[in-house]
Amino acid sequence: MANKMKIHLEADYKTFTAFCPVYRPGGQLAAVEMLTHFAHAQANVVIPQEILIPQLNEHQRVLLLQDQINIIEKHYAFFSSHNINVAINIDERLAETILGSDFLIKKMNQLDCIELEISESFPDIAGGKNNPCLQGLSQHFHLSLNNYGAGKATSKAVFDNLFYRIKLDRGFIQHNIKRGSFPPFISAILDHIKPHCHAVVVQGVDDISGLQSIRHFAFDGIQSALFPPVNEEGLSHLLDPPYLLQQPVLQ
């Protein structure tokens, strides 16, 4: 369902929101990632947020963030009653806007289900807690790292305990999962990072055989194309444990 918000660049776009589930290995819904897509007003074209958001000016970015906050607030009773966190993707520009606004910080802190999600390409992420922007965000919000293992950053920010949730990079998983060295390799990574965050999520396991493989490891969550996103009206359906996660783990 498209939201009423319109954004004008070289053409008009309408936004619509989807929620991508993160399930615990046993099938319980742990969190959702909030995805905003942009639909061209005339052409039948949908553009993902990572392509269009960098083109937005500061005013448009704040409007989009406020729209996301309003949607979370609308469904807050659902998220709160089921202990579900909601991740909003941000970049450095939006992070600085948030930290510069007492109003936004207060408003977002009232919705304690909000996580702010950044990628390894976040500027100076290697600085960890010595990065004032990262440190400021972690003091006010739960932070999620979207693509750990993409190879663009050191682990200092992880070892500085800045992240509530760490998601392994989907390309990293897909590149390594069929290798014979994967079991000891991924076990070592989990031992390495689990003491420094609340939850480690695996991404990129998008087929049944891969899903069976990773269920042998101590991941706290699974985000996969096998569990597709839903719109606002479908949120309650995400509470039903996926059939694939109710099956016994093959030995």
Tell me the role of every PLM-derived stretch.
Residues 81-86, 110-114, 139-142, 164, ...:
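Short, well-ordered coil/turn segments that N-cap beta-strands
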